[in-house]
Amino acid sequence: MDISRPRGTRDFLFAEMRNRKEVEGVLRRTFETYGYHEIKTPIFEELKLFTVKSGEEVVNQIYHFTDKGGRELALRPELTAPVARLYMNEMQKKPKPIKMYYFGSCFRYERPQAGRFRQFWQFGCELIGGRSPLAEAEVISLASESLHELGLDGFEVHIGHLGILRGILGREEIPSELQDRIMGVIDKGDVEELEALLGEVEVSGESRELLMKLIGTQGGPEVLDDVEEYLGGYSESLEALEEFRELVETLHYFGVDDYHVNLGIARGLDYYTGIVFEIYVPELGAQKQICGGGTYNLVETFGGERVESTGFAFGFDRLMNALGMDEENMRMVDVFVIPIQDSTVPEAIRITQELRAAGVSADLEVSGRKLRKALSHADNLGARFAVLTGEREIQDGKVTVKDMERNSQETLPRDEMVDKIKGRC
């Protein structure tokens, strides 16, 4: 029988899991310093949760099924909608803003390729009830600081505002559903398809030219002066531009000054309403985007109160690629304990348990191998020390400790052994 891993999924072995847990730990600590607390949602939800405002491309990629009770369910393709559902079910009466973060796997039926998988992980946060330039700036600051804490260099923060683009479409009286479709094409970056769609929905020549000019606008905060000149009498877009200026000013107080204004960011999810941002690592090429987020109002879309929120998520797998952490030379255990004779197994067990109780990673030779093979196994594990328990040493109240890195050994008093090893690990 040929049993293999499903296409588009991965197995993670010891070294890679160690690295992923290390990065996860840094992100958890950083998010918690900003006052966020962790939540968990189910891996599957009702299908309709994702078909209302997730965007055409995401909807087409959903893994969905009908359960034995006739319910239409789906494996989650992203985590913002489940968080909004959790808020509606459990937290509407709690004081706001509410800060929560999450880490979990998502599923999309995508064509597997470099950097894209059908099961992938997101690490993100949501600030529920927090739409303001101050809230948005703090969220962007958290994303940037998290990457600095991980020691990642060369990343770029790109910030846009959907209100500027939607203000133009609103003046053209384009329905929101068609606006969502246009935003999806802008997000794909397909200029020819965008021009064709704008012509199809009869956007005026003036607005069409303005949209094309805006989505190509990138640079420092100074380009917002040019944008103001472009917008002229588009009042809703000018209001959004003023919000953008307030965000720029507030980011400075958070120490976030290195970013790009990029009005071509539209995001692939239809629920974003205001500020949007993405973080790129250019050296990753086509898969350079490692983070995306912005301001949205999903709760009202789902039938709840109007509560604007801001959040983002790291594509955890791409983040790991960007960090390029070494997977070799992993130490699987600090100490490997080897009983020399069968009669010394009880003492070897006691030593192993004492080391573990002291917080030292310890493993025990349980296969009955000869000393030479047991030491070879300790070396393969990357053990720092091997502890040898022989009958004579036990009678004398001592143990032999072999330094695997220096290829030397010494005899230590039994009652001092744990403290001395702990001090060297």
Curated annotation (Swiss-Prot):
Q: Which family does it belong to?
A: Belongs to the class-II aminoacyl-tRNA synthetase family.
Q: What is its EC number?
A: 6.1.1.21
Q: Which reaction does it catalyse?
A: tRNA(His) + L-histidine + ATP = L-histidyl-tRNA(His) + AMP + diphosphate + H(+)
Q: Which CDD domains match?
A: HisRS-like_core, HisRS_anticodon
Stored PROSITE patterns: AA_TRNA_LIGASE_II
Q: Respond yes or no to whether keyword Nucleotide-binding is given for this record.
A: yes
Instruction: Kindly give the Pfam families that the UniProt entry links to this protein.
Output: HGTP_anticodon, tRNA-synt_His
Q: Where does it sit, as one GO cellular component term?
A: cytoplasm
Q: Which UniProt keywords apply?
A: Aminoacyl-tRNA synthetase, ATP-binding, Cytoplasm, Ligase, Nucleotide-binding, Protein biosynthesis
Question: What molecular function does GO assign, one term?
Answer: ATP binding
| GO BP annotation list | histidyl-tRNA aminoacylation; L-histidine biosynthetic process
The broad enzyme category this protein falls into is ligase
Stated name of the protein: Histidine--tRNA ligase
Which HAMAP family does this one have?
Answer: His_tRNA_synth, HisZ
Its subcellular locations are: Cytoplasm
Instruction: List, alphabetically, the InterPro entries matched.
Output: aa-tRNA-synth_II (IPR006195), aa-tRNA-synth_II/BPL/LPL (IPR045864), Anticodon-bd (IPR004154), Anticodon-bd_dom_sf (IPR036621), His-tRNA-ligase (IPR015807), HisRS-like_core (IPR041715), HisRS/HisZ (IPR004516), HisRS_anticodon (IPR033656)
Major subcellular location class? cytoplasm
